[in-house]
């Protein structure tokens, strides 16, 4: 997939091919892939200019045709929330997750545009250049063909926080950059708050399942609470305030 991005002039990690032109080789009987080193650093406090540029990059990604081999769901999507029943059917978390699912599904529609999406753009998946002027999105392990508004909502959760709280001011710059290349449809504007909640709830689901069931780690068992609380915070904002703060008031479309 990284070759596909490179062929379409989307800046990301680049694969180093073997002498015989192969992308994958083996080391001690294990498949490996070597990528060019990206010089720079990770920042959890992105500037307004970088957020604007990243928004434009996300829109550029969404304009690429989605290869047929991509999955059409995300690996921690709403379709999998019921997996919590296997190990925590009576938990407060599962009850909360189902209530949140109802809230999200009210904004889901077959009319919402779908595209190639990254689905996991957090600050940890972005490399900032040494001069602080450019940002490169990497780690496309969760790429899929899904609602593009999910990608936007997830990126807001992943990159637009200040002291742990959602920053609508930062998100405004992200959307400003995005809409330089893609103008949000009115149904996407209406759904963005729910899909921002979806992004946080999806990560909360993954963390809860991973650290309490799949790869049990008692030191991380409550790690999901950060995202659960963030989802609650997003749902607690009035719809009108959410749109106005992001500069996407539906009345102005």
Name the predicted role of every residue range.
Residues 31-45, 81-83, 201-218:
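A glycine-centered beta->alpha junction motif in the catalytic cores
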